[in-house]
Design a protein with these regions (language model features):
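Helix N-cap / beta->alpha transition motif
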Residues: 1, 37, 106-109
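Short, glycine/acidic-rich hinge or "gate" loops at secondary-structure transitions
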Residues: 29-48
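General N-terminal targeting signals
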Residues: 13-16, 30, 37, 116, ...
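Short, well-ordered alpha-helical packing segments
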Residues: 14-28, 80-83, 87, 118
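Generic structural "secondary-structure junction" signal
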Residues: 6, 38, 46, 54-55, ...
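Sequence/fold signature of self-assembling virion shell proteins
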Residues: 51-92, 98-103, 109-176
Length: 176
């Protein structure tokens, strides 16, 4: 307490300050990733009583899905299927909401697959000279980001331009 009052904390305990800052930053990352890590778990429902990622979000005329019925590994076909599904999203009234994918979020083990899918000019793992439509059309314009705090090594996520998508608020910023 004396060190804090006399502003000696940084000179007397330099490593503890850095460790505390790093620990707080990691805590924020873990909490942020927990939204995705728990997104399929029925024990963490959102406002409609379903998990964040569900094939049965209730709307006025039935249900709508924001995930595959059977989860798929990240590859060209599954990414294209997800993009088409996003473009066909419906709101509670059953109207198309005109969303587009913006960014692919992957765990560390999928970063190599994401790099090949997103940045290869030609189709991945084919002998043909076909163009990579994901690349040439900028289907995911903000590319991909590796989140080291995702706990499922084969889970991947697409963020969209939906106006009320993921938001992060800091009630009070960290002080340094």
């Amino acid at each position: 307490r004396q060190a804090i009052k006399d502003n000696l904390y940084q000179s007397k305990f330099p490593m503890q300050g850095k460790a505390l800052r790093d620990s707080m930053q990691q805590t924020k990352e873990v909490l942020g990733a927990s939204v995705l890590n728990n997104g399929f778990d029925g024990n963490f429902p959102i406002g409609d009583g379903q998990p964040l990622f569900s094939t049965a979000h209730p709307i006025d005329n039935g249900t709508v899905a924001n995930t595959f019925t059977v989860q798929a590994d990240l590859n060209e076909t599954s990414l294209q299927d997800a993009i088409v599904a996003i473009q066909r999203f419906k709101n509670a009234a059953g109207l198309r909401v005109m969303t587009k994918p913006q960014k692919l979020i992957v765990p560390a083990p999928l970063q190599w697959t994401a790099e090949r899918l997103m940045k290869s000019e030609f189709r991945v793992s084919t002998a043909n000279n076909d163009v990579n439509a994901l690349y040439t059309t900028s289907a995911v314009p903000k590319g991909y980001r590796v989140n080291q705090f995702l706990t499922d090594d084969d889970a991947w996520f697409l963020l969209t331009d939906a106006p009320n998508g993921f938001k992060h608020y800091e009630r009070e910023a960290l002080e340094t």
